């Protein structure tokens, strides 16, 4: 330790030793501040409303200037870049001629055209659905009430079912296409007379009337028409095309999930309580319409059993169609469940179940689809404070009784609750109505709550057991936070703050350039003789440290009851240790693994406690391994 690599403008990197190069540390600190000055706020005004990681990139949401709409932004090397939410067109009056599919060309009766980039609807398409189509590469302007058409392939004489995702080939023409949706207009596969329409993408040309439609070389049906695929009316425009926007405000909840079953394909889903939920694939943004007429503004989103679940403050719990997160069609698996209370959290549990939290009740949803969904009341009188549900080894949430763990029992499908914050209950009760956000930290096995006065608590688990709760104070007010992964798959923590910045948590050595004040108070101890007075002479701290720093030591005697004079503060200089990861494999270390720092003290008492403090901007953390106290007995207390 103590060696840093620095890049010189006139040559390759060289090693410089901080122990002999007096300017290295100051130069390093200058570089840190130079980089800090390049960090910018998320554009707009007010709080950062949400922050989330998706496919190695970082996204944030904040109200735009004027608070009329909110914006979605992506972190780049040059700062925050606004995401274009795209053009959309509402539609109704769907027909039985096939469905719109992603990647197909949509044409309006007036000549406007655009490529379907996103699609959401509610109801059953063949009998009249309503929804929204997101369009890219638009030419012209779509207008209200005009017909909307897309090329589909008409077929008849269907004998073997054609499936979504099949690549079809014409037996005579040799043309190919990928099937996205199959619409049956008459007959059936079982009776060898299925007829209808194939909604396709990637078509390579005009097919021949009557030729066989092949899948893996086997005939499945025949082409019905001489100019297939032909443009057919699928729906009617309901209003003109418009630029999508986000409502201002809200509190965002997110989940990433792969509904397509292909490796590496995940999509971001979000909800904010004041607007439609949404889907984002890195390029295209689609607001999800469910058909709720009062307020289609879910607060929570979760993926479970290949359905997207949306939780509402009015007590509704809506699931999407199977593997179709933006489609709310009952014939394809969508349904609405009634919770009866406002949903305050959703979390997938380990035993094929979804935990649904309300403020005063906990529910468990079992099943795999709308055919067997079973929403059961798990606990009446115990629910989750809004926004506090997080999953570590078990699900942790804040209830009126305190921090609560929802863990599975040995019996399949059963759960148990246990309060895990009894020892700090006064603190929990003080802040339970002042929660800003909660965060899980997987690498440290921690659950954190952030309060509205720049303070919070961190609960650490070891082998599934709560080993302690530590309060902390921050220099800035956090509003939202997330635990995500970078492009290497490593966990990173981000917080969105009230000043518009997104800051990486548990990173660096300062509060964004501000000093970090840290302390630890060791318990008072009588060293086996509570009635015997002692003269305390020395404190020897066993430490590990990555950088040199100074610790302030404050010994305190007799529980601080004032019967003895207040002790003097002592300073201890800590030097960085020489241990590093390469030494793990050494058969003979030859270096000190733990550093020792001592302070000569003076004080008399029956017991002593120790307060250790440090304030720094650039010093790295110091780990206290132990403390050895030297003292001599003085006699019994009279």
Residue ranges and their predicted role:
Residues 266, 352-353, 491:
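Structural hallmark of WD40 beta-propellers
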Residues 144-147, 209-212, 287, 477, ...:
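Extracellular/lumenal ectodomain signal focusing on beta-strand-rich modules
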Residues 1-86, 246-263, 380-394, 401, ...:
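Beta-sheet repeat architectures centered on beta-propellers
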Residues 258-288:
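Hydrophobic or amphipathic alpha-helical targeting/insertion segments
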Residues 62-64, 272, 312, 358, ...:
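Recurrent small/Gly-Pro-centered beta-turn motifs in extracellular repeat architectures
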Residues 39-47, 84-87, 241-247, 284-439, ...:
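Beta-propeller and closely related beta-pinwheel folds
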């Amino acid at each position: 330790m103590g060696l840093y690599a620095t890049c010189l403008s006139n040559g390759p990197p060289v090693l410089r030793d901080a122990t002999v190069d007096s300017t290295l540390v100051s130069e390093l600190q200058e570089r840190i501040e130079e980089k800090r000055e390049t960090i910018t706020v998320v554009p707009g005004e007010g709080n950062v409303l949400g922050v989330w990681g998706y496919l190695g990139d970082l996204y944030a949401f904040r109200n735009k200037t004027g608070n009329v709409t909110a914006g979605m932004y992506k972190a780049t090397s040059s700062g925050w870049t606004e995401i274009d939410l795209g053009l959309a067109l509402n539609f109704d009056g769907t027909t039985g001629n096939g469905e719109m599919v992603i990647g197909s060309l949509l044409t309006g009766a007036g000549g406007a055209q655009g490529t379907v980039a996103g699609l959401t609807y509610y109801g059953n398409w063949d009998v009249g659905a309503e929804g929204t189509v997101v369009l890219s590469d638009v030419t012209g302007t779509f207008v209200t009430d005009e017909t909307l058409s897309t090329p589909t392939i008409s077929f008849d004489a269907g004998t073997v079912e054609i499936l979504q995702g099949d690549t079809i080939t014409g037996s005579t023409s040799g043309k190919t296409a990928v099937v996205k949706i199959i619409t049956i207009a008459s007959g059936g596969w079982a009776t060898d007379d299925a007829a209808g329409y194939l909604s396709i993408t990637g078509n390579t040309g005009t097919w021949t009337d009557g030729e066989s439609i092949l899948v893996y070389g086997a005939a499945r049906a025949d082409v019905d028409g001489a100019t297939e695929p032909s443009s057919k009316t699928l729906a009617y425009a309901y209003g003109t095309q418009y630029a999508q926007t986000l409502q201002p405000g809200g509190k965002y909840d997110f989940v990433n999930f792969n509904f397509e079953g292909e490796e590496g394909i995940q999509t971001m889903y979000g909800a904010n309580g004041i607007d439609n939920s949404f889907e984002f694939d890195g390029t295209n943004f689609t607001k999800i319409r469910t058909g709720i007429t009062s307020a289609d503004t879910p607060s929570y989103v979760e993926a479970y059993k290949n359905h997207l679940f949306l939780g509402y403050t009015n007590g509704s719990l809506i699931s999407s169609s199977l593997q179709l997160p933006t489609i709310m069609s009952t014939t394809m698996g969508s349904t609405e469940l009634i919770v009866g209370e406002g949903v305050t959290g959703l979390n997938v549990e380990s035993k094929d179940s979804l935990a649904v939290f309300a403020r005063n009740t906990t529910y468990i949803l079992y099943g795999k689809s709308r055919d067997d969904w079973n929403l059961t009341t798990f606990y009446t009188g115990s629910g989750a404070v809004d926004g506090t549900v997080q999953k570590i080894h078990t699900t942790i949430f804040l209830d009126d009784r305190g921090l609560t763990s929802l863990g599975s029992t040995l019996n399949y499908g059963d759960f148990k609750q246990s309060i895990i914050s009894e020892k700090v209950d006064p603190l929990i009760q003080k802040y339970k109505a002042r929660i800003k956000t909660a965060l899980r930290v997987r690498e440290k096995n921690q659950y954190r709550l952030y309060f509205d006065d720049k303070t919070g608590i961190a609960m650490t688990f070891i082998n599934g057991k709560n080993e302690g709760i530590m309060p902390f104070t921050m220099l800035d007010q956090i509003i939202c936070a997330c635990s995500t992964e970078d492009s290497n798959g490593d966990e990173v923590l981000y917080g969105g703050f009230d000043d518009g910045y997104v800051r990486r948590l548990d990173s660096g050595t300062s509060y964004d350039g501000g000093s970090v004040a840290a302390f630890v108070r060791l318990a008072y101890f009588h060293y086996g003789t509570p009635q015997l007075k002692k003269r305390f002479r020395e404190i020897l701290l066993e430490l590990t440290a990555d950088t040199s720093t100074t610790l302030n030591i404050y010994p305190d005697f007799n529980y601080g009851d004032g019967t003895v004079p207040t002790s003097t503060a002592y300073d201890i200089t800590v030097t960085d240790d020489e241990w590093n990861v390469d030494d793990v494999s050494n058969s003979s270390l030859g270096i000190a693994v733990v550093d020792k720092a001592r302070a000569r003290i003076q004080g008399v008492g029956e017991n002593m406690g120790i307060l250790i403090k440090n304030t720094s901007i650039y010093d790295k953390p110091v780990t206290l391994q132990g403390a050895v106290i030297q003292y001599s007995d003085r006699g019994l207390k009279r």
